[in-house]
Amino acid sequence: MALNDFHVSEPYTLGIELEMQVINPPGYDLSQDSSTLIDAVKPQLTAGEIKHDITESMLEMATGVCRDIDQAAAQLSAMQHVILQAASEHHLGICGGGTHPFQKWQRQEVCDNERYQRTLENFGYLIQQATVFGQHVHVGCANGDDAIYLLHGLSHFVPHFIALSAASPYMQGSDTRFACARLNIFSAFPDNGPMPWVSNWQEFAGLFRRLSYTTMIDSIKDLHWDIRPSPAFGTVEVRVMDTPLTLDHAINMAGLIQATAHWLLTERPFKPQEQDYLLYKFNRFQACRYGLEGVLTDVYTGDRRRLADDTLRLLDNVTPSARKLGADSAIDALRLQVKKGGNEAQYMREFIADGGSLIGLIQKHCEIWAGQ
């Protein structure tokens, strides 16, 4: 299958996708009623889109093209309002978090959608196990070569994005000992992790052509890389974050990625090389396992440094770009988070350590998303 031409988009514009949990009180397991909610809210939308994801317990909120985080926040807030209203009318709850802590994958119903049914045929039970919840951020690029450079540049900071957003310590009723267990779900997929090395858009088109030979790849959407180009939108899409518990944190993560993209494309601080990726999965694992307490290893020098310290360095580097884009509030909030030394996975564990239950945890998450 031929690859779409790269659609020219305004650099640094934003799109945000949030995969939300649809919850069934009073037991607070996952519901299978996302279709009911989607049908109820679609006529009320004035911007953005609310749609299905893989299974009937998932609901995706997606903004339109936004010039800055304020516009994105306004669209997401409006969608949040109509979803919460519809959920209340149908006696359902909505919450964030990268995993549901005690759902059973065997109970998950794959959406009655041609693409997802085809994916179920290809991947079997792996698709039901992929009932996990992430935040994706699109950043606009002027051309395909810029998109490939940006993808490689952003890949340096995949551990930082994971650690800041980690919100999936529990799965199948157990503490996984990971800050972000969600990404482990995709480890069995043949396209898990970083995109195979290419140096420009022409080489990427050749890569896509070869991948399509497998008959498992019909479009870019069938590739589950941590970061991928989206030629139809003219963007690069970062896909490694857990869905946050609050809309504010989702906006902060989007602001960081937007500012990082601006810094990378204007300063060009890296000359991408294939060797950059030799320790990619090791550093990614550190972020998933330990969050901000993880340790990064420099592939060229062997130097090791705390992920929290390197994240503060990233925030300092992108601050001038954030100011130009109107995203400095996001950088300030994330800097405070790092200095306090926590993420949402840590909060969840503290809730349980204080005597809370996993059912109570999801109840609390629904209250947080509803602003209670």
Swiss-Prot record:
Return the broad EC class. Answer: ligase
Give a single Pfam family match.
Answer: GCS2
Reaction(s) this enzyme catalyzes, per UniProt:
L-cysteine + L-glutamate + ATP = gamma-L-glutamyl-L-cysteine + ADP + phosphate + H(+)
Give the UniProt keywords, A-Z: ATP-binding, Ligase, Nucleotide-binding
Do you know which InterPro entries this protein is assigned to?
A: GCL_type2/YbdK_subfam, GCS2, Gln_synth/guanido_kin_cat_dom, YbdK
- Describe the protein's quaternary organization and the partners it interacts with: Homodimer.
An example GO biological process term is: modified amino acid biosynthetic process
What protein does this entry describe?
Putative glutamate--cysteine ligase 2
Q: What is the documented function of this protein?
A: ATP-dependent carboxylate-amine ligase which exhibits weak glutamate--cysteine ligase activity.
Domain of life (superkingdom):
Bacteria
Q: What is its EC number?
A: 6.3.2.2
- Asked if the record carries the keyword Nucleotide-binding, the reply is yes
Gene Ontology molecular function, alphabetical:
ATP binding; glutamate-cysteine ligase activity
Provide the family line.
Belongs to the glutamate--cysteine ligase type 2 family. YbdK subfamily.
**Keyword Nucleotide-binding carried by entry:** yes
